[in-house]
């Protein structure tokens, strides 16, 4: 988490209000991420073969510190999933990254993270790019295919 304590407290308050409308799986808590969660984010990302958090950790950490919403799902003390979004707060929220530990899938954690993002900004649409293996999950959450996504990476 960045050093802006006021912003962190505001995010916690916003999330508390949003979570009043979210059904959480048993034993799962969703909270605002902190820098201490970054190694767990790297672990889960690595298991998905996502290179940025491990090959470019400084850039990835910076992205997490400057994104909102940036949430983790925890079971006890263990981070079992995360979502990082980017929003204008009015029209669109882009889900930049979301992953659930493979051993924890099927419990409703991903849906709860997406619902938390939605209820933080209930008038925005949620946009994302999906890998083929996750399409059925997103469709079950109410998403629809709209266009073919594209990406150009510089590293």
Located regions from the model:
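Helix-loop element at the rim of GNAT/NAT acetyltransferase active sites that forms part
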Residues: 32, 43-55
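Conserved acetyl-CoA-binding loop-helix of GNAT-fold acetyltransferases
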Residues: 100, 106-119
């Amino acid at each position: 988490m960045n050093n802006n304590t006021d912003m962190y407290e505001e995010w916690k308050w916003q999330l508390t209000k949003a979570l009043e409308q979210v059904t959480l799986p048993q034993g799962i808590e969703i909270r605002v991420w902190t820098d201490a969660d970054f190694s767990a984010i790297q672990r889960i990302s690595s298991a998905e073969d996502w290179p940025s958090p491990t090959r470019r950790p400084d850039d990835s950490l910076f992205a997490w510190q400057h994104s909102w919403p940036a949430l983790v799902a925890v079971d006890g003390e263990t981070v079992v999933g995360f979502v990082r979004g980017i929003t204008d707060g009015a029209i669109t929220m882009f889900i930049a990254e979301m992953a659930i530990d493979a051993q924890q899938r099927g419990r409703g954690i991903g849906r709860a993270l997406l619902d938390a993002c939605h209820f933080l900004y209930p008038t925005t649409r949620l946009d994302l790019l999906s890998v083929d293996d996750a399409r059925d999950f997103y469709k079950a959450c109410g998403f629809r295919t709209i266009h073919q996504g594209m990406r150009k990476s510089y590293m």
